[in-house]
Structures are given as structure tokens and as C-alpha cells.
Amino acid sequence: LILFFCLAQLWGCRAVPHGPILGYREPACDDVETEQAALAAVDYINKHLPRGYKHTLNQVDSVKVWPRRPAGEVFDIEIDTLETTCHVLDPTPLANCSVRQLTEHAVEGDCDFHVLKQDGQFSVLFAKCDSSPDSAEDVHKVCPNCPLLAPLNDSRVVHAAESALAAFNAQSNGSYLQLVEISRAQLVPLSASVSVEFAVAVTDCVAKEAYSPTKCNLLVEKQYGFCKGTVTAKVNEEDVAVTCTVFQTQPVVLQPQPAGADAGATPVVDAAATASPLADVPAASLVVGPMVVAVPPGIPPVHRSHYDLRHSFSGVASVESASGEAFHVGKTPKGAQPSIPAADGSVPVVRPCPGRIRHFKI
């Protein structure tokens, strides 16, 4: 009986197919394909940020490419980003946005993404990010007298934003602007001033006639703007300097319609509003791919000095990841790896990562 059992086990082992086990490959972090996946990830960040500033790619730290059945590949990619000076509501293309410099107290993002490539198209399956300002020590090494980021709920910051917006509305011949969010602030001790940046929305009231601002409503076709102000304390008074830019609404690019469809007038929407869920999604929600996921209560923290990316990208998978075979990062044998010949002609296995730094490292 024991001999029969052993023979059965041996026959079962012979019956197992010895096909190859699919593994991952590790392309260079600066490969064209890797950069395409990274740029798709950055585009995803900027389209789903509800507040704060757009981010741009700074460096690809690592990348693994896994096969995905029934079709496509998944890029498991880690990237570093830097905050730009463009607010998320600003329709300015990212390529035209300046990176915030070290002397301005720069902010860096650190993100992990799973990006699907299928039929030449990239789509995000999973996103997890966090961001943080440069350390005070590093800022002062570069610029000893440069001001640091201040908490956005600091009473001096709130007062500066309200005073700057009130001053602008008082001098404006256009629509009354309403505060949307305070985005950034710095306390400047040498001049006893507060520098503040904030987003605004256009209302249906005329600025100089808005005697009851609470009765003013946002436009049906929402339109946003961005302001920068400085409030300087003087003896028994304060000086206020402020500039505001209202973003232009842009026409929708219509898709081809079936024959007989109603060819009405082209609707006009705010490009900045479509780039962010702020206008259409409740404050307690965020958009992740094609789905809306509730954010855990109590965030973002009250005493924040910037909008941390982790409050929008906390590792929630997109609905797209449910299509086809699920993707899981596992301990699978590697596939063919790129290599760089050594001076003696041997070919050591070298993974050319991390990639180049596009701006500066924090």
C-alpha cells in the first residue's frame, strides 16, 4: 500500500506542467516608456487634487513591469514630484507652470503608482502619495532670511486673506469674488507682513454693489480665480497689496453625435473646474478613477501649512483594476533584466535606477 501511494505521488508530480512562470522586468528609470507611465501618474494627481497646487515630475525612483492577463502590463512605479506655482483650479498647462523654488519653501511629493499599459494607453489602477515641505534647516541654508510656510488657520493668515480679498472687491468694477480656500501663507518677520495666496470664485453680484455678500451665489457655469496678497502692519493701520486673476472659461470639445441628435449650442464650462472635483463632488469625497470614494473623517488636519497629497491619494484602487485578472505584486521570479557591460567585458546585472533629477532634490 505504501509503495502504491509513493508511485501515485510520483505520477502526480510528473503530470504537473513545467511551463515558464511569468515574472517582472525592470526597465531603466529614464526609459521613454517608464517616463510615459510616470507622466500619466502625474497627470492623474493633478486631475484629482481637490485643492492646493499642481505637481510636476522630478524623479523616477524605481520601476517594475508586471505582465497582466488577459492583456497589458502594469508599471509598479515610485516617483518624486515637486509642487508648482499653479493652483489646481488654474487651467494653465502643466508644462507652463513654474516649479516652486527652494527659497520659496518648496514642497516635495512621494508617490507609489500602479499604471496599466494596454493598447498603447496608460491608466492608473492604484495611487498612494504623501507630500511634505522642505525642512526649515535646509531652507535657511540656502536663504537664511527666507520666511517659512505658516499654518493656514493662523489668525494672522486668515485676517490677511480676508483683508486682501475685501480690498480687491472694493476696487473692482467686475463681479464680487468669494473666498474658496487659503492655499499658502508665509509670515515675514523683518517687514511684519503676511504673504498669502488663495483661490476665489466668481459670483452673480457686482463687487461694488455687494452689500450683502451672503446673498451672492456662484455662477451656474462656475468660474474661479487666484489671488496673491500681502498685508503689512503699520502703526494703527495696515497696508494691503493684492492682485487677482480670474481664469477664463473654455469651450467643451464635443464628441461626434449620432445622426439625429440635438445639435444645440456648444456649452461653456470652466476648464479648471473640470480638472478638479472641488466644484461637483461633496467636500467629504474625492474622485479616484471612475469612482467616488469617501474620505475618512477628520482630514485634512486643521494646523496644516500645505495640502498633503496623502489626503487624496491614500492607496485606494481604481475600479479599473477590477477588470481582467487582478494585479498583485508578488515574489515572482524576475524576467530578463537590463544590464550594462563592465570595463572588462563582463555583463553585471545593473538596474539603472533611480532616474535623473529634473529640477532639484529636497
From Swiss-Prot:
Residues 1-15 form the signal peptide. Expressed by the liver and secreted in plasma. Phosphorylated by FAM20C in the extracellular medium. Pfam families: Cystatin. Disulfide bonds join 29-353, 86-97, 111-129, 143-146, 205-216, 227-244. CDD domains: CY (cd00042). It is found in: Secreted. Belongs to the fetuin family. This is Alpha-2-HS-glycoprotein. It comes from Sus scrofa. The gene is AHSG.
